[in-house]
Amino acid sequence: MPNYDLPNPAPEPLRGVQLFVNSIDREHDREWLPGWLEEHGLPQSEFDRAAALREALRALLYVHNVGGAAPEASAYVNEAARAVRVELRGEEVVLAGADPLGEVIAVALTAMLDGTWKRLKVCRNCQWAFYDTSKNRSGSWCSMQLCGNRLKTRAYRTRRRGAAA
């Protein structure tokens, strides 16, 4: 995976889910999931399972941005979550023998409970996961410098063409 700073990083540990979802760059057709698997000690034979989870999470995050529902993605994550075991150790809930994909699921489920999940979204333009820091949760771009600027420039040009006609 590339060494990069996310324009709008999620707080830890949700940032790990954000990095996992961003293990593909659709705009430049780059696949970083094999590196993610290696970095987290998983064999390459887990690629299909990891890619399916990543795309299910991406679909759920896209809904945060555009509305609607993603029933197939929800069903996939629910099924994958059944394999994640937690234990109570004293006052703390911990994962019991979960692999890194199980940890991604557990963090996502925890974020759903603590309210941070709905702030993690997928950019309408480039499909990059970003954390919405706006007060009213209305952010729709990964960053103003990247997609926001592109889309505003495109809209401006469209308006100018319409006014000139």
Regions found by a protein language model. Name each.
Residues 1-131, 165:
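Short helix-coil boundary/hinge micro-motifs
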Residues 120, 139, 144, 150:
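Residues immediately within or flanking Cys/His clusters that coordinate Zn2+
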Residues 126-127, 136-142:
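Cys/His-rich short segments
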Residues 132-133, 153:
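Short, non-ligating residues that shape and space the ligands of small metal-coordination modules
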Residues 133-134, 145:
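Short beta->alpha connector loops at strand-helix junctions that form conserved
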Residues 145-164:
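Basic DNA-binding region of bZIP-type proteins
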